[in-house]
């Protein structure tokens, strides 16, 4: 079947609705919607939940942008895109909980298509989800990765190991020599064997995110914590900011191509702290995190 951008867009809009409803049901607070238009073509729906019962901030952003020609930054690496009109659409979300025992989570699913008369369209899917704990719980990590593995299973035995490895490699802070979290799935440039197969996989990832995340939230949201845990959470959130502003391709692409800054930076934690030359106390739960987030096979 030939690529159907309209079908993908409808799925993404419905997915945004579903995820927001599921997060609101856990939190008790509602999302505020901000619809926006892009002068050069397209627009989106940004939804933010702030200072809820469970989530300090949760942002679920849908965007659909299109144009007559690709920006030079994109065609430099892919000369076959030159002279084509394009559509890019996706959902990107980040959840920052109040409780330091509840991990931060991120998910993204996206579709890109570039066309010109008389030529086959160039298209692909990308996406994934990853988890950033502040305090490590093995059962949470196993559940997260088991959910990821199980949703990949119908698409082939090699899919989960391949996309887990890609996730571990992508969410890595080179300047700190450490992982951002415990990973999950990451895929890009997916266009084989055909549109239907790739679209089905993207849908499985999009729907799988809340199955992976919400049971962990429910398990940890009522755990007692104090100033020490909160301070460590704010310190570790600094790594999230560093990754997004220094290494994340999506953030950089959005800012360099005149994307909507408020939506792009919606992933930022609302509060964060840095501390010069900080080292957690030996043997403390905080010190255990650096070992916990090292790459390993969780399932």
Swiss-Prot record:
One of its GO terms (cellular component) is cytoplasm. This is Oxygen-dependent coproporphyrinogen-III oxidase. Belongs to the aerobic coproporphyrinogen-III oxidase family. The keyword Transcription does not apply. Its EC number is 1.3.3.3. It catalyses: coproporphyrinogen III + O2 + 2 H(+) = protoporphyrinogen IX + 2 CO2 + 2 H2O. Residues 240-275 are annotated as: Important for dimerization. It is found in: Cytoplasm. The record marks 175 as: Important for dimerization. Keywords: Cytoplasm, Heme biosynthesis, Manganese, Metal-binding, Oxidoreductase, Porphyrin biosynthesis. The active site is at 106 (proton donor). GO terms for molecular function: coproporphyrinogen oxidase activity; manganese ion binding; protein homodimerization activity. Its cofactor is Mn(2+). Homodimer. Involved in the heme biosynthesis. Catalyzes the aerobic oxidative decarboxylation of propionate groups of rings A and B of coproporphyrinogen-III to yield the vinyl groups in protoporphyrinogen-IX. One of its GO terms (biological process) is protoporphyrinogen IX biosynthetic process. Mn(2+) binds at residues 96, 106, 145, 175. It comes from Escherichia coli O17:K52:H18 (strain UMN026 / ExPEC).
């Amino acid at each position: 079947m030939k690529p159907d951008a309209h079908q993908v867009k409808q799925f993404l809009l419905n997915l945004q609705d579903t995820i927001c409803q599921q997060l609101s049901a856990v939190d008790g607070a509602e999302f505020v919607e901000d619809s926006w238009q892009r002068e050069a073509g397209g627009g989106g729906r940004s939804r933010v939940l702030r200072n809820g019962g469970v989530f300090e901030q949760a942002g679920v952003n849908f965007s659909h942008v299109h144009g007559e020609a690709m920006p030079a930054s994109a065609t430099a690496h892919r000369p076959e895109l030159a002279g084509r009109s394009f559509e890019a659409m996706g959902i990107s979300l980040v959840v920052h909980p109040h409780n330091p025992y509840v991990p931060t989570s991120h998910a993204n699913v996206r579709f890109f298509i570039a066309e010109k008369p008389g030529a086959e369209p160039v298209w692909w899917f990308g996406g994934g989800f990853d988890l950033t704990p502040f305090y490590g719980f093995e059962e949470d990590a196993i559940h997260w990765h088991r959910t990821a593995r199980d949703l990949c299973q119908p698409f082939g035995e090699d899919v989960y190991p391949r996309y887990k490895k890609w996730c571990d490699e992508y969410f890595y802070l080179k300047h700190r020599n450490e992982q951002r979290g415990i990973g999950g799935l990451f895929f890009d440039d997916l266009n084989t064997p055909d549109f239907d197969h790739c679209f089905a996989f993207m849908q499985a990832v999009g729907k799988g995110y809340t199955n992976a995340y919400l049971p962990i939230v429910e398990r940890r949201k009522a755990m007692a914590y104090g100033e020490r845990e909160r301070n460590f959470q704010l310190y570790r959130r600094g790594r999230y900011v560093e990754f997004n502003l220094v290494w994340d391709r999506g953030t950089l692409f959005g800012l360099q191509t005149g994307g909507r800054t408020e939506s792009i930076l919606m992933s930022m934690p609302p509060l964060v702290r840095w501390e010069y030359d900080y080292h957690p106390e030996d043997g403390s739960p905080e010190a255990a995190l650096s070992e916990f987030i090292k790459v390993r096979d969780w399932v």
